[in-house]
Amino acid sequence: MKSIYFVAGLFVMLVQGSWQRSLQDTEEKSRSFSAPQTEPLNDLDQMNEDKRHSQGTFTSDYSKYLDSRRAQDFVQWLMNTKRNKNNIAKRHDEFERHAEGTFTSDVSSYLEGQAAKEFIAWLVKGRGRRDFPEEVAIVEEFRRRHADGSFSDEMNTVLDTLATRDFINWLLQTKITDRK
């Protein structure tokens, strides 16, 4: 993508340069025609025209210099911004985010570890088939229908819960050798 922009920029510069050159050639040709001998040349007018031309050339060159200088300053500013962003500001932000995330991560890890320990302890005790107390609530949710269309969402939730319960019961009731 950058190469396309680069080629387009070069093309624009070439076209602009050719237009400026053709305009300069046209101006030089109009100046190179000598005035007829019958018309007297006024030296004061000739000097004013030369003066305006030299001032215009200086102004044009100076504006080109200022444009290139602005471009250099902009590139330098971009480079400095990128350096500062990568070194100081970004490191500070990452450090803060890391500290906040570490606490959250530690709490989450602790809670996950506790849940895993409780589940393993429950499996080791071998309670056998577990009756879920929420079975009654699940049956009631089956029968209930809402006018706002949440029936299908609740139906999916109920079916997921039933499938999970059946899977856990299957895990508890089958032997390890049967699962292979």
From Swiss-Prot:
GO cellular component terms attached to this protein's record: extracellular space
Induction note: Glucagon release is stimulated by hypoglycemia and inhibited by hyperglycemia, insulin, and somatostatin. GLP-1 and GLP-2 are induced in response to nutrient ingestion.
Tissue distribution of the protein: Glucagon is secreted in the A cells of the islets of Langerhans. GLP-1, GLP-2, oxyntomodulin and glicentin are secreted from enteroendocrine cells throughout the gastrointestinal tract. GLP-1 and GLP-2 are also secreted in selected neurons in the brain.
Sites annotated Cleavage: R52, H53, R83, N84, R91, H92, R97, H98, R130, D131, R145, H146
Signal sequence extent: 1-20
Bilayer-crossing regions: none
A GO term for molecular function: glucagon receptor binding
A Pfam family assignment: Hormone_2
Keyword Phosphoprotein: yes
Family: Belongs to the glucagon family.
Protein name, per record: Pro-glucagon
